Amino acid sequence: MFIGIVSLFPEMFRAITDYGVTGRAVKKGLLNIQSWSPRDFAHDRHRTVDDRPYGGGPGMLMMVQPLRDAIHAAKAAAGEGAKVIYLSPQGRKLDQAGVSELATNQKLILVCGRYEGVDERVIQTEIDEEWSIGDYVLSGGELPAMTLIDSVARFIPGVLGHEASAIEDSFADGLLDCPHYTRPEVLEGMEVPPVLLSGNHAEIRRWRLKQSLGRTWLRRPELLENLALTEEQARLLAEFKTEHAQQQHKHDGMA
């Protein structure tokens, strides 16, 4: 997969190219990340990349010419079929469904804004889609771009050590992930749920699904509103709610 980055701070992406899952993907040749800085396309000796907005107001905008030239260079390197994405608070909010959708593209170009943003005409002429990672403001698009790269890379075959990992991630099926445990079996009096030690794979699957449903109901109930639960899922969620109510009643009685 090819990912081109247009950023004033390409050095920030060493966190992606040199470390962790994405770093291994780059080393294996599964992920090709290249970057272009608008500063390299500035025409003046000061390498100016910002300019005042028409109409006044605080802050500066990224200058059109260096930014467009950097995007064009990235497009030329990517070849036909590259999707150009601008990381923006006004964009579609990134979720697991969106990540899965983006992962079907073999070529992405991520444009990272700075200052107060970019000229609207650049968005109209150069950008295919706008994406956001949340309803808050950051200093630039680099961190959202890294978030997008990390999440999309998990779908590239061979990137994860276990191919089922991406399928079983939180949100992969619209639900939060279930709790996980490793050694020791007992930690400060807290025991690993016995079912996970039983070796009964059918019961383990059932327990994990129940916990996933229950955790979603407790922490992100709005996610359940968009799901058509199977008969088994509805039954397990009802069991979880009953067990949770009993635990709460027991806890309240001890208080």
Curated annotation (Swiss-Prot):
S-adenosyl-L-methionine binds at G113, I133, G134, D135, Y136, V137, L138. The keyword Lipoprotein does not apply. It is found in: Cytoplasm. One of its GO terms (molecular function) is tRNA (guanine(37)-N1)-methyltransferase activity. Its main location: cytoplasm. Specifically methylates guanosine-37 in various tRNAs. This is tRNA (guanine-N(1)-)-methyltransferase.
